[in-house]
Structures are given as C-alpha cells and as structure tokens.
Amino acid sequence: MVRGARKAIAVGVAVAVACGLQKHLNFVPGPRHAAPVAAAAASMMMAPAAFADEIGDAAKKLGDASYSFAKEVDWNNGIFLQAPGKFQPLEALKAIDKMIEMGAAADPKLLKDAAEAHHKAIGSISGPNGVTSRADWDAVNAAIGRVVASVPKAKVMAVYDSVTAITDPGVPAYMKSLVNGPDAEKAYQGFLEFKDVVEKNQVATASAPAVVPSGDKIGEAAKALSDASYPFIKDIDWLSDIYLKPLPGKTAPETLKAIDKMIVMGAKMDGNLLKAAAEAHHKAIGSIDATGVTSAADYEAVNAAIGRLVASVPKTTVMDVYNSMAGVVDSSVPNNLFSKVNPLDAVAAAKGFYTFKDVVEASQR
C-alpha cells in the first residue's frame, strides 16, 4: 500500500532526484567498487556544501564523458516503468525501503537543491529523445553526487545490494545494446572516476532522526481518516502490476510536466517533515502483511506525516500538482480502480479524506 499516490507526494521528490542518474547507469555491469554512487541510480539524497566545488568539478568531467551517451538514450521509452527483472513486488519493496532509509539520512538542504536542479533540467529538455541541456546534465549529476556524499557508505551499499538482488543480470547488456557501445563505455569510465570523488567526500555518520510533531490537529484528523479508510486500504490489491502501467493516452513528455509540478512541491516542503515522512514510510513497510497492507497504526502515522508535509507547502503549489495530475489521468483510471474494491469502503474513505483535507488546508502556511 505504501506505493500509492499519497506516497508519491511524500517522497516523490526524493525519488525524482535520482531518476537522472538511475537511467544513465542502466548499462553498467555493476562492480562493487562502483557501488557507493551506483546506488544513487535507484535512490535519492546529497552532501555537505564544503564539497560542492570538488564534486561539481568532477560532475563536469563526467559530463564530458557521458553527454554523448545521454543524447543517445531514449528517455521517453516506457521501459523505465518496467520491473528490472521478474515482477516480485514484495522483494522490490525491500529495495524501495532501503532507498527510503537512504533518503531519510540525507541532508534536507541538498535534497532541495537536487530537486531544484531536476526542475531546471526538465525545463531545458529538447529533441525526440527528451534529453536536457549539457549544463543542466552537469548540474543534476553534481547535485546527485552531493546527495550521495551526505549519506554514510553503509546505507548507500544497502541500496546497491538490494537493487542488485531484483535486477536480472541480462539488463545491463540489453540497455547497452540500445545505444552506441563505445559511448556507453566512455560514460561508464567517467562514472567510475566521478564515484571516486563522491566517495572521497562521503560522510561517516548519518544525520539525526526527524523531530515528529504530536498532539496537533493534523494528527487527530489523520486518526479519523485512518479509521474511515482502513477497510478500503485492505480491499486494494497492492501486489498488482497496474502501478507500473503508463497512463492511458498520455505521452512521456506530457506526464513529465505533472512530475515536474511534484518536484517543485517537494522542493518547498519542510526538511524535517520530509525526513519524518520517509521514516514513517520505512516503519510502515516493516509491518506489512503478505498482501502488502501495513498495520492500522502505521497507516495512521503515514497519513499524519503526509498531511503535515502538504501543510508545509503553499496551497497554490499543491493545487498545481492536483491540476497537472488531473490533466494526465483519464477518467477511466479512477473508474477502473473503483471497480476493484468494495464501493461502500471506497466512499467512506473518500468522505474521510475530504474531512482530512479541510484540516490540512486550515493548517497550511
């Protein structure tokens, strides 16, 4: 259940931070000595500002080595939505959990910077393959490098190992076959040099856990929402592959505009509350049952964390996300999902959500 739309708001920006590097690393074989930064390919995060120049310089060198390759990648290809091997959602969730843990350990300021770099890069996308400008390519890689350097190596390695466990060994060779081989190899060598600079600047200890608010109106409203909607949550097939399907009738560039609004929203979120939401999701993953449903208590905690996150963002920014998503989600999508659950449970959940929304809006800055 933690893969639903609410999670997208809570940690979607953190996932987006990694998307750029993730896709251009898909061709690499994945030796363990490359792991500290390779993990970022599937995750999120950052590093101390004191390292900005060194990592920034290294990112420019990486750009020299990899931009030709980047222009060859079809960034609009639906393959990036697919599982990197056998579809096994509960195993994949273990890898996602490691990414969330890594994200929670990251420096919130650098996460914000990385999100803003991605937003800018989306603005310079051009050409049939959907590639960003060279300057923005470098800026995104530098931002991701700083993200990774702000997380202890052990947490980065945990992501690397968990993603390796669910990735078919034939994936790297297949991805390499879609581009010019020599350009891919040159990009990979540049990546190895970049990861050495990032690892050199990596922190040894994680940041402190988030301070979680308590006794607030959003927390109380989250309990009411959870009581009203938990039966509906248990009706949902969280192990379905429907969540990997592209939105019907929409192209990748059209969908990316909505994702961009999410990134902008994420960049404006309170850093402590974002960390708290990631930690709540991590705990919720730990209590899921065989059907993918978390405990009632953890479900409530996740709802409260997301409500506080949304309240930390101006209403206009939240509405930008709502309107952009409404523009790319066909009416057949909610109708199809509604048909798969108990309608009375769905209606009760919707009523609970509307009440919760009002409390969040009243608390919004």
From Swiss-Prot:
Keywords: Chlorophyll, Chloroplast, Chromophore, Light-harvesting polypeptide, Plastid, Repeat, Transit peptide. The keyword Transmembrane helix does not apply. SUPFAM superfamilies: Peridinin-chlorophyll protein. It is found in: Plastid, Chloroplast. Residues 1-52 form a transit peptide. InterPro entries: Peridinin-chlorophyll-bd_prot, Peridinin-chlorophyll-bd_sf. Sequence repeats lie at residues 53-215, 216-365. One of its GO terms (cellular component) is chloroplast. Its main location: plastid. It comes from the Eukaryota. One of its GO terms (molecular function) is chlorophyll binding. The record marks 118, 281 as: Chlorophyll a binding. The keyword Chloroplast applies. The mature protein is composed of 2 almost identical repeat units. Water-soluble antenna for capture of solar energy in the blue-green range. Peridinin is an asymmetric carotenoid. Monomer. This is Peridinin-chlorophyll a-binding protein, chloroplastic. It comes from Symbiodinium sp. (Dinoflagellate). The lineage of its organism: Eukaryota, Sar, Alveolata, Dinophyceae, Suessiales.
